[in-house]
Amino acid sequence: VEMETGTGKTYTYIKTMFELNKRYGWSKFIVVVPSVAIREGVYKSFQITQDHFAEEYNKKIRFFIYNSAQLTEIDRFASDSAINVMIINSQAFNATGKDARRIYMKLDEFRSRRPIDILAKTNPILIIDEPQSVEGEKTKLRLKEFHPLFTLRYSATHRKDSIYNMIYRLDAMEAYNKKLVKKIEVKGISVSGSTA
């Protein structure tokens, strides 16, 4: 999904979660973000849109930020039948060697289980926010360890070599025409693929 900056990418993928739950019953989602700052912004978006979506869908999403010191959240994520979202920044699962992350370790305080195994058993839907900042080769391999049902990638600027199955594209002109942005400035025009 390609959406112009400032047009509601986070809102759109939260609504997508509700729709996927409503239509197919899917309830496990992991939002992968490139940085702590974006992670905090995404968390805030979940907070401020919670009542709005509860009104529309008559249910709430249970969301949390992955924290290797609060592993009970992962158990709750796996066992709860409601819509559950874990927000995680790529650094939390993307180190190896002596810096190996706790998500891959058998932990005494987690009944000698590995957090990644519990998450993978849920076959979550991965939502990657700004994939061009997240999807290096090592990260792509690590993402597979979540055993996702499928992956949705949301960005304003997908890299040309990493566009897979584009299902929606909201470019600057369309965003302006839909009154999603106040003003655009055009230096030159070149139209590339549209899903309209």
Please report, for each region that a protein language model flagged, where it lies by residue.
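RecA-like P-loop NTPase motor core of helicase/translocase proteins
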Residues: 1-196
